[in-house]
């Protein structure tokens, strides 16, 4: 069933004084598979239109011949694909490894999956292999890899290297305290996959968080990482990259903690929230405790608890009110995982945590928001994916599931909700949409994923659809938060 494109951009059409219409450029359907990944873009075939890279999967523990997908941005046709033994849920890190002036792909997934792929053809450059069961740190690096971020070249080969977290025994039941092993933060050579440094979480706890790297105003290479999970408490840490290189994460400072039986899962973000020229840090715990940390003193600027909710969703960062301080948007889940029963959207003033906007649209999900000023009024709209069904059934119910997936834009000035797309019988639990200028024509494009809902199981896969929507919105300012972990794919707002 083809999507229904609604008139989100009809008002924008007149506001931007253009005759261009919003339209569906293409949709590509894949049977059997789904995805927990979010799209990234590179121009693979050098036709002037960026192409799409994303991970894909079947259900857990099942191998897949189409585990990483490269799609032509013009047509949606498959350019290349590669296999994996389990789910590839990471979103790609893009860096030229081979020296051919084309970006290559580093992408992660479940049970130790981490590969570097030639961006031109998908051939494996290197593949992580778990080999060390004796080393007290590396023996725990057989679990899940999360999104990597680029860091400065550490081994003087002229190529940026990667910072990445391994952890999370997915076979451990929610109440299992025995089979939970310390997460391991790693620096790896992006060219060869060699481990350059690794150390365990300072508190010895598990980790599911993609790390953050930034260089401070004072020239310090900071790394930010978290511990804990849905049912076990944890901390957010800040350390220097040198601490990790020296295997000395015990020097890390705890900058946020959650003692309520929840850890830190969603990736943190970085922006200047107090206008002092220093990069600050914002994080959200699984119990929906939001903390903003001063990047100069590493002290708390403000905290806000969203009661009776949980969160594994990261933020979008943008201009959501009239001041000049970046603000935060996310959505959190009502109820207790895995019986999450609804979703709450919140926008917070980056300066003090005061509420700009809240609503309760759709049911729970794990994707994240993106934002752009669609109507040129100086305040960014937020674009999110929501699923509408009987939210009270939770994730594990075996009751009948009638579901509709929607892509919507929220006007944070008027609180109006405008619908971009709706598809009945489809869902999107995990994937964050991408907004970009795919063909560099000066107009906003949207890349968006949906998954066929074939039975009662919200989390299973049996077919996916990827869409490119061409909008009538003329790009007048840089897209500053256009995808998962931001436009730069690194969690930093600039």
Language model: regions and residue ranges:
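Bacterial Sec-dependent N-terminal signal peptides
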Residues: 1-21
